[in-house]
Amino acid sequence: MDAPPNPVEPDVIERVRAAKAARRASGLVYAERPRLAFIVHSFNRVSNIDQIVDGLRAAGTHELIVCDDGSVDGSPERWLEHLDRPNDFLIHSNDLHEIRITDRAISWARSEIVCLVQDDDVIPDEPSWVQTALEHFADDPALAVIGGFMGFDSFDPDPAVAMPLWGHGEFRYVHHVNIGPYFVRRTSYEQLGGWDHTFSAPGDPGICFDSELCLRAWTNGYRVGYSFVPLKGAAGHYAMDGGTVLFTPDERERNRLANSRRIFERYADRAAEIDALVEHANTQRP
């Protein structure tokens, strides 16, 4: 019998067998329908990876999907050192930016609830912030999104115009929230059509895309909630050293202004309707 044209080396066969045996011995099993999936957008922030993994692991045995968007600082290699569980995944892309790569990751997830985390976030070392969010989703089938960074009691996406809710307090319904963390019910996301890809070209910032989905949710029978989680630091604090600020500050500002106009054009004539929906939802809270 002829030798195969592309033989697998014997040492590779042994290493594969050893790896399979180690996985079986670990006791970890693949979850077909995990309760929650964390999705991390990663872009050249290798120094924060260990801390993110430690914090997310402390939150429970959940799915972890990392979207490394073309980092050049060794981030993919560092992620691979950590992603060793059956429900861990690493998606590689080439600077598509958050809208497109997280959209693909949400469709990849097998949990009903996903939680979007950014690569500059500092994850709490106790899990109550995750459990609380999951309880809110269980209590309200119409709840599509929960944000933990800033919430807004106006449809205006600009914090300079609509003063944000930014700090501790009980859960409440709000007009819109932004990422970090950003919990979303996957079926609601899909029924709403997902992120609006017109909010950025591939590789460009997509400022306000997270807020727009919230406003779209309210006008389609869903609800949006806010409960502060200090992933960006203490209430009222944000270092403003995220990727778009560091790498493309001018494009970021142009994008913010353009997308703010988009939101006004779409929702200005429905502002009173959204106001009433938010107010009514809050009166129904236990």
Q: Language-model features: where?
A:
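N-proximal low-complexity "stem/linker" segments adjacent to membrane-targeting elements
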Residues: 1-54
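C-terminal catalytic/acceptor-binding lobe
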Residues: 3-19, 31, 201, 205-286
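Short, acidic, metal-binding catalytic loop of nucleotide-sugar glycosyltransferases
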Residues: 51-63
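A conserved acidic beta->alpha catalytic loop
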Residues: 68-77, 122
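Glycine-rich, basic loop-to-helix element that forms the pyrophosphate-binding segment
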Residues: 92-109
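A recurrent flexible, glycine/aromatic-enriched loop bordering the glycosyltransferase active site
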Residues: 99, 152, 166-187, 206
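Short beta-strand-to-loop acidic/aromatic patch adjacent to the donor-nucleotide binding site
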Residues: 112-122
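Conserved donor NDP-sugar-binding/catalytic core segment of glycosyltransferases
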Residues: 122-160
